Amino acid sequence: MKGIRLCGSGAAVPRLRISNDDLSGRVETSDEWIRTRTGIAARRVADESESLTSLAAAAGKQALERAGWDASSVDLILLATSSPDDLFGSAPKVQALIGAGSAVAFDLTAACSGFLFSLVTAAQYLRTGAMTRALVIGADQLSRWVDWDDRRSCVLFGDGAGAVAIEACPAENDGLLGFRLNSDGARGDCLTLAQTSERAELLPGMSHQRGGYAPIGMNGQEVYKFAVREVPAILKQLLADTNTEPASIDWLLLHQANQRILDAAAERLGIAADKVLSNLANYGNTSAGTIPLMLHEAVSDGRIQSGQLIASSGFGAGLSWGAALLRWDGPTS
């Protein structure tokens, strides 16, 4: 079996920045209330000139540039998203915008765990030798599905995209040292973007369901309890699987959902606060975009260096959660 090399990163966010003070003009809230409970100061929201597809393509192009690849060399594009521009899939459109005509492209939906699930999925194609190069993109435009009059949820989410270019390599240079993935549909009702339907007449005496989607629904307390229990647990299992001591981890890269969750997970793992990567203050929760967006930012500013060990975990709706132990081997700063 081959190994996987992480070769380049990219990111894209909308131009429009919505601060906590801006939101306080629409709902009863304040900068202090939001920061204290979430760690978020602002979020980016796509306007009418931007889309999930355009953000994903921009992030993907940058990852290819940083990896030094021509788009024609990519065999696979996986787009992790829960908010596609087209329910039939947005990855093929991203493929066209990038110019990766030789790549098979498809969407993978696993909410805020989506990027990590997609990275692991893409890696399996490369490990077997079926493919050589893959582009994994995490992108969401959840602003389309937020109830902007619900102060419990509208303060949390933003739009954004991140991408990582990976390629097959000799097993001894493997950059995906281990992973674990979990799902539990029995607990899924605490975080939903659920279908709605209404009866519509099709023919006399015959009807069908006309569909749509309700705004994001969330039981914040249950989501918090789920995250602070399962994220440290799955990371501890992964570190045990790979015979890795927490002290040897250079960076903890978690899904950027809430600063309280990041802090609690790090404390339970015994990982120092200065090893916890966070950009929640600037972007909020971009769902499948958070991990690659944070990775790219830390690579670009020189925090993450080639050869460093990264413990990562994604978690969210489904419920779904996973963890991966990564070694960065792409360009930095």
Swiss-Prot record:
Subcellular location: Cytoplasm
Alphabetical UniProt keywords: Acyltransferase, Cytoplasm, Fatty acid biosynthesis, Fatty acid metabolism, Lipid biosynthesis, Lipid metabolism, Multifunctional enzyme, Transferase
Entry EC number(s): 2.3.1.180
InterPro entries per UniProt: ACP_syn_III_C, ACP_syn_III_N, FabH, Thiolase-like
GO biological process terms, semicolon-separated: fatty acid biosynthetic process
Gene Ontology MF terms in the entry: 3-oxoacyl-[acyl-carrier-protein] synthase activity; beta-ketoacyl-acyl-carrier-protein synthase III activity
Pathway: Lipid metabolism; fatty acid biosynthesis
Catalysed reaction equations from the record: malonyl-[ACP] + acetyl-CoA + H(+) = 3-oxobutanoyl-[ACP] + CO2 + CoA
Keyword Phosphoprotein on entry: no
CDD domains hit by this protein: KAS_III
SUPFAM superfamilies (UniProt xref): Thiolase-like
Catalytic residues (positions): 112, 255, 285
Region (ACP-binding): 256-260
GO cellular component labels: cytoplasm
Subunit record text: Homodimer.
Family, similarity comment: Belongs to the thiolase-like superfamily. FabH family.
Domain notes: The last Arg residue of the ACP-binding site is essential for the weak association between ACP/AcpP and FabH.
HAMAP family, sorted: FabH
PANTHER family referenced in this protein's UniProt entry, alphabetically: 3-OXOACYL-[ACYL-CARRIER-PROTEIN] SYNTHASE (PTHR43091), BETA-KETOACYL-[ACYL-CARRIER-PROTEIN] SYNTHASE III, CHLOROPLASTIC (PTHR43091:SF1)
Protein task: Catalyzes the condensation reaction of fatty acid synthesis by the addition to an acyl acceptor of two carbons from malonyl-ACP. Catalyzes the first condensation reaction which initiates fatty acid synthesis and may therefore play a role in governing the total rate of fatty acid production. Possesses both acetoacetyl-ACP synthase and acetyl transacylase activities. Its substrate specificity determines the biosynthesis of branched-chain and/or straight-chain of fatty acids.
Protein name: Beta-ketoacyl-[acyl-carrier-protein] synthase III
The organism of origin for this protein: Synechococcus sp. (strain RCC307)
